[in-house]
Amino acid sequence: MISPSLELLHSGLCKFPEVEGKMTTFKEAVTFKDVAVVFTEEELGLLDPAQRKLYRDVMLENFRNLLSVGNQPFHQDTFHFLGKEKFWKMKTTSQREGNSGGKIQIEMETVPEAGPHEEWSCQQIWEQIASDLTRSQNSIRNSSQFFKEGDVPCQIEARLSISHVQQKPYRCNECKQSFSDVSVFDLHQQSHSGEKSHTCGECGKSFCYSPALHIHQRVHMGEKCYKCDVCGKEFNQSSHLQTHQRVHTGEKPFKCGQCGKGFHSRSALNVHCKLHTGEKPYNCEECGKAFIHDSQLQEHQRIHTGEKPFKCDICGKSFRVRSRLNRHSMVHTGEKPFRCDTCGKNFRQRSALNSHSMVHIEEKPYKCEQCGKGFICRRDFCKHQMVHTGEKPYNCKECGKTFRWSSCLLNHQQVHSGQKSFKCEECGKGFYTNSRRSSHQRSHNGEKPYNCEECGKDYKRRLDLEFHQRVHTGERPYNCKECGKSFGWASCLLKHQRLHSGEKPFKCEECGKRFTQSSQLHSHQTCHTGEKLYKCEQCEKGYNSKFNLDMHQRVHGGERPYNCKECGKSFGWASCLLKHQRLHSGEKPLKSGVWEEIYSEFTASFTSVSLCGRKAI
């Protein structure tokens, strides 16, 4: 493999005086300044860390070639990749046999590796160059006993600047930066008045020097010549591949000095360290929110602009962040690269695997101070707290409906657009979200992976299991402000509040009758059609709702999953348990007026079902 610096040399970005034979005669003395390329701090800031390292390597190689032009050029095959501790090692061998038969061997010191994401500033790069330049010059000076007069162009050695290692006497009047080498100082001064004459044809970005333009153009070319042997992922820079491979090996060489946490890259460590210092230097001009990293600010600003530059080629869905597009793409491919070692379950995201792992160790580090409920991850804890505060910060611009979470708003907005991007392969039914499609697919295969440890009941969705478990725990976090009644689920509270307000938003188009719940409307509509979709396999009795079928099947199975903690009596239905518990608590049912309204509505609905059933017969 040819080194990045040699690649630049071969592409014509950096050119040196041609060597004719064994010696080169210069009409004018060649200095390092003549072959160096300088970036301004602004231009250098546009390069990623790997490109900065490449720039540094090119500059180092410039003066190495300058030192060796009086001798045979060094061999390309003397470059060796050293892996973790050192990046490139170059042995520049110049051999000349004088009359004394002596041999000259000049070995440049190994350039230490910069971490794949280490931020090299202009000053650091040029100090490294100046330091290596001085070492190389001393090597020639120490080996001068092997040369005869005229063997090496004296002008080169004479014009190579000698660095002041301990001092920095050269100070820039523009930016007050100091330098130890006069050549580096001269080159730096050019950066303040540099004309940007090299323009990118793709995006119009301008640069002072052609090498900077060529490095930038690789972003548009999209060339990815470095491939991971483990997962096949491709990268356009070898340093990015090295960082990625640490994900597979688990290597985290960059440790935080305060908390000891390890990271794959130095840039990730630098971002983490700002958590300890509280530094957030990047501020949003729209809302004033501050961020640790500039990339976080750029992603946040897209919320204000509405920009979603990352589009899925399969379904056309757009995203603000590339990582979310990558995560979304796995929905179409079915890829789940993160596997739980305990139960073998696979996940699309490492964070989901980490959250799942806590299920096995039963650790719930985040506790709600109001209700005492524990949570595995902080995100779920923050979501839960909105239940108590009633906060709903996400508004639908179409209908004004508010939501606690952005994901719920996104799902709701698809109702207005009518877009159902997730199709069931079995029956072709469309769904707004992948989770709903996954839940639906379990109706085809009968899978119920979520099991209640109390009563052994199985559920298709985790949410259904969590709702069911509240029956056993007695948890009722949702309170009615009108009558003080508490409920286990927000949907039950909403339905109950309609009794106080008298709201009946669900209307039958056949007879005009209105209902407080959509399920009541669906059950009522079967009266007009006479349809009974749900059949009992044991007695073949038909029902117009699955709920009624489930209730009926308990008659055959003798199932009584609801137990009274006071006396141990068991019941087939939660409503029967609730009524029974009032005997122990002395709780009175709803006020007569409200109860009469519920009863009249129930009997009317029941009567209409019965009448329609008789007509169907």
Swiss-Prot record:
<feature type="zinc finger region" description="C2H2-type 7">
    <location>
        <begin position="338"/>
        <end position="360"/>
    </location>
</feature>
<keyword id="KW-0862">Zinc</keyword>
<feature type="zinc finger region" description="C2H2-type 13">
    <location>
        <begin position="506"/>
        <end position="528"/>
    </location>
</feature>
<protein>
    <recommendedName>
        <fullName>Zinc finger protein 221</fullName>
    </recommendedName>
</protein>
<dbReference type="GO" id="GO:0000978">
    <property type="term" value="F:RNA polymerase II cis-regulatory region sequence-specific DNA binding"/>
</dbReference>
<dbReference type="GO" id="GO:0008270">
    <property type="term" value="F:zinc ion binding"/>
</dbReference>
<keyword id="KW-0805">Transcription regulation</keyword>
<feature type="domain" description="KRAB">
    <location>
        <begin position="30"/>
        <end position="100"/>
    </location>
</feature>
<feature type="zinc finger region" description="C2H2-type 2">
    <location>
        <begin position="198"/>
        <end position="220"/>
    </location>
</feature>
<feature type="zinc finger region" description="C2H2-type 8">
    <location>
        <begin position="366"/>
        <end position="388"/>
    </location>
</feature>
<dbReference type="GO" id="GO:0005634">
    <property type="term" value="C:nucleus"/>
</dbReference>
<dbReference type="Pfam" id="PF01352">
    <property type="entry name" value="KRAB"/>
</dbReference>
<feature type="zinc finger region" description="C2H2-type 10">
    <location>
        <begin position="422"/>
        <end position="444"/>
    </location>
</feature>
<feature type="zinc finger region" description="C2H2-type 11">
    <location>
        <begin position="450"/>
        <end position="472"/>
    </location>
</feature>
<dbReference type="GO" id="GO:0006355">
    <property type="term" value="P:regulation of DNA-templated transcription"/>
</dbReference>
<keyword id="KW-0539">Nucleus</keyword>
<dbReference type="GO" id="GO:0000981">
    <property type="term" value="F:DNA-binding transcription factor activity, RNA polymerase II-specific"/>
</dbReference>
<dbReference type="InterPro" id="IPR036051">
    <property type="entry name" value="KRAB_dom_sf"/>
</dbReference>
<feature type="zinc finger region" description="C2H2-type 14">
    <location>
        <begin position="534"/>
        <end position="556"/>
    </location>
</feature>
<dbReference type="InterPro" id="IPR013087">
    <property type="entry name" value="Znf_C2H2_type"/>
</dbReference>
<feature type="zinc finger region" description="C2H2-type 1">
    <location>
        <begin position="170"/>
        <end position="192"/>
    </location>
</feature>
<keyword id="KW-0804">Transcription</keyword>
<dbReference type="Pfam" id="PF00096">
    <property type="entry name" value="zf-C2H2"/>
</dbReference>
<feature type="zinc finger region" description="C2H2-type 3">
    <location>
        <begin position="226"/>
        <end position="248"/>
    </location>
</feature>
<dbReference type="InterPro" id="IPR001909">
    <property type="entry name" value="KRAB"/>
</dbReference>
<feature type="zinc finger region" description="C2H2-type 9">
    <location>
        <begin position="394"/>
        <end position="416"/>
    </location>
</feature>
<keyword id="KW-0238">DNA-binding</keyword>
<feature type="zinc finger region" description="C2H2-type 6">
    <location>
        <begin position="310"/>
        <end position="332"/>
    </location>
</feature>
<comment type="similarity">
    <text>Belongs to the krueppel C2H2-type zinc-finger protein family.</text>
</comment>
<keyword id="KW-0863">Zinc-finger</keyword>
<dbReference type="InterPro" id="IPR036236">
    <property type="entry name" value="Znf_C2H2_sf"/>
</dbReference>
<feature type="zinc finger region" description="C2H2-type 12">
    <location>
        <begin position="478"/>
        <end position="500"/>
    </location>
</feature>
<feature type="zinc finger region" description="C2H2-type 5">
    <location>
        <begin position="282"/>
        <end position="304"/>
    </location>
</feature>
<comment type="function">
    <text>May be involved in transcriptional regulation.</text>
</comment>
<feature type="zinc finger region" description="C2H2-type 15">
    <location>
        <begin position="562"/>
        <end position="584"/>
    </location>
</feature>
<keyword id="KW-0479">Metal-binding</keyword>
<keyword id="KW-0677">Repeat</keyword>
<feature type="zinc finger region" description="C2H2-type 4; degenerate">
    <location>
        <begin position="254"/>
        <end position="276"/>
    </location>
</feature>
